[in-house]
Amino acid sequence: MTAVDFAAFVDRLAQVSGEVILPFFRSAIVAEDKSRGGIFDPVTEADRAAETAMRRLIAQTFPAHGVIGEEYGTERADAEYVWVLDPIDGTKSFVSGMPTWGTLIGLMHLGRPVYGMMAQPFTRERFYGDGRRARLRTLAPARGDAPPSEWMIRTLRTRACQSLVQATLQTTSPALIREDADRAAYLRVEGEARLSRYGGDCYAYCALAAGFVDLVIETNLKPHDVVALTPIIEGAGGLITTWDGGDAAKGGRILAAGDRRVYEQARRLLVGRR
């Protein structure tokens, strides 16, 4: 069975999670802090309920598969197929009413990411890829005040960017880059980029896959933050690794780029080489 064979099931997971999450968005939802005294790290009833719903559907449909989730941990991590879930990536944006959050659904086969989706139910967008191709499914723009009439699918491709001085750079927040040396490294790249933007969460990576952003730089990521995004970015022609060129699916310090030329320039600055 290939990753493509799971595509319809991933759509079901996205539909189920979206139905759970949307009633909570832009409501008076309570956010708990799970940081234990560190940087505010919210979790909500919507996060937990959506992951529960997805886990239930996976267990019913593929009982031998493993699951790694942000809210409820790991089951059968050594299974041939492992689902990697982040029900709301960007919970800070979610509780602030900003639509840059998304549901991340990743599938690993023998430890390698083979399919991923970022579903944004509020904007009704689904970015998905298998490492060879990546697409966006969204509702076609309506004319006037008429409601959108049908789904539209378009191929995602990263854009050419040969130099940092031409690049648009995204990070969720420099405040989340906790180590002084890492922050200094990030600022070296930001200092040479044409434009820097903050607050994108998972949406920044999909904007990169769609050709609107050239670089995304983050630290302290977990597998559930990045596994789903890897096949989307690679399928769109981009690169995503750790700062030292390693496997991004394990998390840590992450660099994503749409063009290898700007990737190499950014990575040299991140690791202290010019």
Protein language model annotation of sequence segments:
Residues 1-8, 141-151, 274:
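Short, low-complexity, intrinsically disordered N-terminal peptides in bacterial proteins
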Residues 77-139, 143-149:
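DPxDG-like acidic metal-binding loop motif
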Residues 157-274:
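An extended, acidic
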